[in-house]
Amino acid sequence: MAESDWDTVTVLRKKGPTAAQAKSKQAILAAQRRGEDVETSKKWAAGQNKQHSITKNTAKLDRETEELHHDRVTLEVGKVIQRGRQSKGLTQKDLATKINEKPQVIADYESGRAIPNNQVLGKIERAIGLKLRGKDIGKPIEKGPKAK
């Protein structure tokens, strides 16, 4: 018990800097002066809540010299979506709600502005009951027996 005097204070734990303090310009400069590794990265699309990002290979797009654009949904597919939606008596908003997408997504697909996404196309196909992919575009989907 000789090492514990009444006058000395032993600090057992010391809190580190909070997240806000660690991000400050002052903290970054201090860490650089100490020679520590500092990693800075910018958040990408943080507040935009993007559900379906473009998954096409951008490096492949960069290597192409002739056409520097992604393929869009054809107008034929857009017209089929529009006809199928109207035959079911749905508005763009109703169809979007039914497939858990935003109304703007449906508008983009119908106008031919959207980059095709198989997941979204599959949901629209099931909702309107018409094929949108492959060679039989516009034909009704045959419903087979359910697998058990």
UniProtKB/Swiss-Prot annotation:
The IQ motif, which is involved in calmodulin binding, overlaps with the binding domain for nuclear receptors and transcription factors. Its phosphorylation probably allows a switch between the two activities of the protein. It comes from Rattus norvegicus. One of its GO terms (cellular component) is cytoplasm. Residues 69-108 are annotated as: Interaction with TBP and NR5A1. Residues 48-58 have a biased composition (Polar residues). GO terms for molecular function: calmodulin binding; DNA binding; TFIID-class transcription factor complex binding; transcription coactivator activity. One of its GO terms (biological process) is cell differentiation. It holds the Pfam family HTH_3. Transcriptional coactivator stimulating NR5A1 and ligand-dependent NR1H3/LXRA and PPARG transcriptional activities. Enhances the DNA-binding activity of ATF1, ATF2, CREB1 and NR5A1. Regulates nitric oxid synthase activity probably by sequestering calmodulin in the cytoplasm. Might function in endothelial cells differentiation, hormone-induced cardiomyocytes hypertrophy and lipid metabolism. Keywords: Acetylation, Calmodulin-binding, Cytoplasm, Developmental protein, Differentiation, DNA-binding, Methylation, Nucleus, Phosphoprotein, Transcription, Transcription regulation. Residues 37-113 are annotated as: Interaction with NR5A2, PPARG and NR1H3. This is Endothelial differentiation-related factor 1. The modification N6-methyllysine is found at K25. It is found in: Cytoplasm; Nucleus. Residues 81-135 form the HTH cro/C1-type domain. Gene3D superfamilies: lambda repressor-like DNA-binding domains. Residues 34-67 are annotated as: Disordered. The modification Phosphoserine is found at S4.
